[in-house]
Regions:
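Acidic/histidine-rich catalytic neighborhood of metal-dependent amide-processing enzymes
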Residues: 121-123, 127-168
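Acidic/His- and Gly-rich active-site-bordering loop/insert found
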Residues: 2-124, 145
């Protein structure tokens, strides 16, 4: 294992409980694509998590999605907020990361969250994609702790409407 990988391994050591607790808490928040209030609550959690990074964070309102109802009338469907975090945009190398924080599940009971085999969490949005967000943030956190991190810039997009086809 090279020095960078050892440094990343040290950064990740002991973080499993923190990551699982974060995932469980986030899966306990409804962030159904059409639940604008739930998306707002989830976006606030994400903004809180991004505070630990040396990144500039921008929150953008998306335009309403225009749909047609059963009577043929146009209706505006509000969407959640897009979150964009940028770290070291002047660095010689850049990485773009993107993931969504909405879920396909409408509001649900917290009882649907359960730990399987003491290690696997089964929960609405756990794999798609709140678990991916947790892993991505942990990886970024570990990366930020190694020598040479200043040579790489990154930009992270957190999308609130992927399950709808990203109309915003």
């Amino acid at each position: 294992m090279n020095d960078d990988l050892r440094a990343i391994d040290r950064q990740l050591a002991g973080r499993e409980t923190i990551a699982v607790e974060r995932l469980e808490a986030w899966c306990g928040l409804s962030s159904y694509s059409r639940d604008v209030g739930g998306l707002l609550r989830m976006s606030e959690k994400l903004l809180g998590a991004l505070e630990e990074f040396p990144a500039d964070v921008d929150v953008r309102a998306l335009p309403d999605e225009m749909t047609i109802d059963d009577a043929g009338e146009a209706i505006a469907q509000p969407l959640g907020r897009l979150i964009v975090a940028r770290c070291r945009p002047e660095a010689p190398r850049q990485v773009l990361l993107g993931i969504h924080y909405d879920t396909v599940y409408p509001s649900f009971a917290r009882e649907r969250i359960r730990l399987l085999d003491g290690r696997r969490l089964a929960a609405p949005g756990g794999a798609d994609a709140k678990g991916g967000i947790v892993v991505m943030l942990e990886a970024l956190r570990a990366f930020e702790g190694i020598d040479g991190a200043d040579e790489l810039g990154w930009e992270l997009f957190l999308n609130p409407d992927e399950e709808l086809g990203s109309p915003g």
